[in-house]
Amino acid sequence: MEVTEANLQLLAGYLQQTLSADPNVRRPAEKLLESTELQQNYPILLLNLIDKAQMDMTTRVAGAIAFKNYIKRNWAAHLDSDGPDRIHESDRNTIKTLIVTLMLHSPVALQKQLSDAVSIIGKYDFPKKWPQLIDEMVERFASGDFNVINGVLQTAHSLFKRYRYEFKSQALWEEIKFVLDRMAKPLTDLLQAKMQLTKVHENNAGALKVIYGSLVLVNKVFFSLNSQDLPEFFEDNINTWMGAFIQQLAADVPSLRTADDEDAGVLEHLRAQVCENICLYAKKYDEEFKPFMEQFVTAVWELLVKTSLHTKYDSLVSHALQFLSVVADRQHYQSIFENPEILAQICDKVVIPNLDIRPSDEEIFEDSPEEYIRRDIEGSDIDTRRRAACDLVKTLSINFEQKIFGIFGQYLERLLTKYKENPATNWRSKDTAIYLVTSWASRGGTQKHGITQTSELVPLPEFCAQQIIPELERPNINEFPVLKAAAIKYVMVFRSILGPQVLASCLPQLIRHLPAESSVVHSYAACSVEKILSMRDASNAIVFGPQILAPYTTELISGLFATLSLPGSGENEYVMKAIMRSFSVLQSAAMPFMGVALPRLTEILTQVAKNPSRPQFNHYLFETLALCIKIVCHADSSAVSSFEEALFPVFQGILQQDIVEFMPYVFQMLSVLLEMREGTGTIPEPYWALFPCLLSPALWDRTGNVTPLIRLISAFIKQGSAQIQALGKLSGILGIFQKMIASKANDHEGFYLLQNLLSYYPPAEIQTNLRQIFGLLFQRLSLSKTPKYLSGIIIFFSFYVIKFSGSQMAQLIDEIQPNLFGMLLDRVFITEMGKIPKEQDRKMVAVGVTKLLTETPEILQQQYATFWPRLLHSLIDLFERPPEKLMGLEIGETAGVAEDPDAGYQVAFAQLTHAQPNQQDHLAEIKDARQFLATSLSKFAQARAGEFSTLLSPLEPEYKQVLQKYCDQAGVRIA
């Protein structure tokens, strides 16, 4: 693809089409760009378009976003597999040559996207493959151009912010040191220069805005560079930085004050970041920070007292309160808070004002209920005043429990008295009281169980009976909706503390609130019902089973479905999750409702498929459908055809229209339906019409499709291998196997597919391909020997030995390369088999290795005989030692990195709990692998009496003792 004017115009046209609201215009353009992005010069063409000043800015921004997403998808894709690099080497070098300069002279809208692209490239290439990046950036500090400097700082922030969350490692330390050696001093010099410039330009509002914007970014970079450990340079220059932070907290620049009450200005952002920085130091480096502590506590306190309740200050106040919480939690700073007068002032001037619901919060409650819910019960309120005030209350009540009890008790009484005087006017006082009690009493808990540890001084069940239940019993469910929501949340949060009796009395009231007009109220009602129904007792039995639910079942199910018809709740995830949970608890007792529920669920699926926009709702919708299939088909297995009749048209529409968000779910649902048919005869024709499409390479390029597709293909193999053979599709399946085995992320799926082929496909045809299959396994072993792959290949070969024979395996392997079987034993089985983590896999390996030892003559041949005692030694280790924990060994486990917020977007695979595949134990007849070893060795010893003692002689005495123990337990002899 040449960089020509004609190609630039063509690319611009397609980018404009990707912005269309019409999917018939947008999707073809997206697909075309996706199909051309692997051509050489494609990214260079994009960069040229972004740099073209004459081009429409909307198109340039679309190009910048497309470039960033291209980098996300492709820059590191080859690291996952042994496939070719998707980006030509010359393009990589050109990108790294052009991008920094292009970013720095681009408008802000483009700069942000390009900066993100730099940080993604830097994550993989910096510093080893891109060492000049830092020097190139630091050089620009001397340019004197504020916008260029801010561009560099934005890039540094994007590049280094992963230091905040990555796990510690030697490689990470080395990278941070590389950065500090080049960046720490220039950053400190820049801080001092910018602080000086605030005085030089004190009468130039435009310049001050850019200068203070620079300081915000300087502080963000400082935070990232200090997140892992305290660098020596910053410790040596702590006075410079802390002095600047004090000045920044005190800075009051009239020209930078904003008239807007909602959006924070640059000063608010600056102070919030300062509070975040000093919070980090107070938490992690309190010894070095100690000399500055009182000065900062005073500065933050003064800032809090004079800061108004406007929304624009929320992040600042939140971080300031977090700082006070950290200080109050440190024993050697607690003297600051021990004075009862100071505690009373904190409660009066800081805690209560920030616990109160504000007009802006009420506005969000009414107009943006989803945002309110996210903040209030989903934990996205990390930067809200209420959350920070609650955390401060919790910290103070833990560390100064007796002193704070009296102070908070007085406030609580005052708030409740005020409410009683005039509920219609003073309902906000009770809302504050509920929040105060919640944060005051809470000591610890989990998302799954709610609050599980509380203060003994706060009588929660009594407060619930006197203050919460009366609110829920009010006849008008639409009265005081904010207060209703707070009361429902109280029940939900303290469900593990209140006990089954109290909850049983609350349950009908919660169900009664499902039709409430307020989205927040009926969402909270659904959410609390779901969480209460999820509760289990000490024996893991459901606390509220079908018998307890029986009086309310009709009202519950009809109420939940009716809620989905309320304005704004057509795709309410809490309601759909509650429907799922209700059916899960009811099981067969849900059958009377299926006649109404199933058509409604199918109708909802048809509607949401047109525009999938609520991932959580969609997930629980599919969960509910999968659960319904299991409940109904458990009662009547022939009902599967009714489900197929209802759902196939919808599924076919989803697949034909390439609705990528739903495909992983559709493949799981098809697997469930097909597995339900096992043993009932041939696979119906509609499945076979779909089968060739399942082998399409494009489907397998989407990571979210891989696991459910492997399961679906395996179901076809299990029930229809003869038909697959007749269709001549084995080569297509083997192509998928080859793709899976080449991938570090998906090699386990390749092994799973291969096991199914060997188990259910006609042996004669699969045997002709075995040499090629084994060759691919050894090729991957030599190219990329990851711990997960080693585990997979050991399990697979053990399975092969059990299914066929060790002799057949040894002969086939040695045909590929002489003595390769011995290398497999020596370098893979003997050294690695003890590291396999899962019990069922360890059993498979134990039985397979036992058969190698006792039923495989090849291992007794001269060139392999020395491996026999070593293999037995490793097998005993497998039995006697716990599995070693290995990075990235478990499927889905991430090796050594925290979740990466910059990872490229792809529809992920989300396993449906109610569509889990049945676990198959290939060795159900073998109850104890140790006894199987003992019995097998006993037979082997009898058959080869003279040979056996020679083979066993190199084994250490303690291992022989363990072996004797196995024999005693099995009641057999080996000597």
Curated annotation (Swiss-Prot):
SUPFAM superfamilies: ARM repeat
Example GO molecular function: nuclear export signal receptor activity
Domain Importin N-terminal residues, every copy: 29-105
Keyword Ligase among record annotations: no
Cystine residue pairs: none
Compartments, as annotated in UniProt: Cytoplasm; Nucleus
Taxonomy, superkingdom: Eukaryota
GO biological process: protein export from nucleus; protein import into nucleus
Assigned keywords, A-Z: Cytoplasm, Nucleus, Protein transport, Transport
InterPro entries per UniProt: ARM-like, ARM-type_fold, Importin-beta_N, XPO2_C, XPO2_central
A Pfam family the protein falls into: CAS_CSE1
Role, per record: Export receptor for importin alpha. Mediates importin-alpha re-export from the nucleus to the cytoplasm after import substrates have been released into the nucleoplasm.
PANTHER family (alphabetical): EXPORTIN-2 (PTHR10997:SF8), IMPORTIN-7, 8, 11 (PTHR10997)
Similarity comment: family membership: Belongs to the XPO2/CSE1 family.
Descriptive protein name: Exportin-2
Species for this entry: Drosophila melanogaster
